From Swiss-Prot:
The keyword Protein transport does not apply. GO terms for biological process: antifungal humoral response; antifungal innate immune response; cell differentiation; chemotaxis; defense response to Gram-negative bacterium; defense response to Gram-positive bacterium; embryonic digestive tract development; inflammatory response. InterPro entries: Chemerin, Cystatin_sf. It comes from the Eukaryota. It comes from Homo sapiens. It is found in: Secreted. Induction: Inhibited in psoriatic lesions. Activated by tazarotene in skin rafts and in the epidermis of psoriatic lesions. One of its GO terms (molecular function) is signaling receptor binding. Keywords: Chemotaxis, Differentiation, Disulfide bond, Inflammatory response, Secreted, Signal. Disulfide bonds join 77-87, 98-117, 101-135. Expressed at the highest levels in placenta, liver, and white adipose tissue (WAT), and to a lesser extent in many other tissues such as lung, brown adipose tissue, heart, ovary, kidney, skeletal muscle and pancreas. Within WAT, expression is enriched in adipocytes as compared to the stromal vascular fraction. Expression and secretion increases dramatically with adipogenesis. Highly expressed in skin (basal and suprabasal layers of the epidermis, hair follicles and endothelial cells). This is Retinoic acid receptor responder protein 2.
Length: 163
């Protein structure tokens, strides 16, 4: 069974997720991520999403946590015009690989967000681990810290008798 699951997982990872296949929460998360990316001051050109590598939404008591991995490519438009349909992807434009962690509350209120889109050549292993830690913080946004049990949270040890 395990032999079948590994090739299936590799195939699904290579195929990716189309934008049409995203849930409503995932589409909203992608929209929030693109808005956040284009607000960033160093970004001067508009970027367009070219593919969604993975998309997961998880319900929590405070809202829905959406984790997205997607790719962006530079367009011929300036960043203020990023929503315009006439913005076409530049064939040799810069490419970015993004990780977005968005926590949506009731009525799509954004409780927390993390959008990290380094240029594809700058992706480092240590940076990915750091981003995962920040992503977990976004995942817990708006949640009651006492509503979850974490192993070791209530660990006690019996003291040795005094001799």
């Amino acid at each position: 069974m395990r032999r079948l699951l590994i090739p299936l997982a590799l195939w699904l990872g290579a195929v990716g997720v189309g934008v049409a296949e995203l849930t409503e929460a995932q589409r909203r998360g992608l929209q929030v991520a693109l808005e956040e990316f284009h607000k960033h001051p160093p970004v001067q050109w508009a970027f367009q999403e070219t593919s969604v590598e993975s998309a997961v939404d998880t319900p929590f008591p405070a809202g829905i946590f959406v984790r997205l991995e997607f790719k962006l490519q530079q367009t011929s438009c300036r960043k203020r015009d990023w929503k315009k349909p006439e913005c076409k992807v530049r064939p040799n434009g810069r490419k970015r690989k993004c990780l977005a962690c968005i926590k949506l509350g009731s009525e799509d209120k954004v409780l927390g967000r993390l959008v990290h889109c380094p240029i594809e050549t700058q992706v480092l292993r240590e940076a990915e681990e750091h981003q995962e830690t920040q992503c977990l913080r976004v995942q817990r946004a708006g949640e009651d810290p006492h509503s979850f049990y974490f192993p070791g949270q209530f660990a006690f040890s019996k003291a040795l008798p005094r001799s």
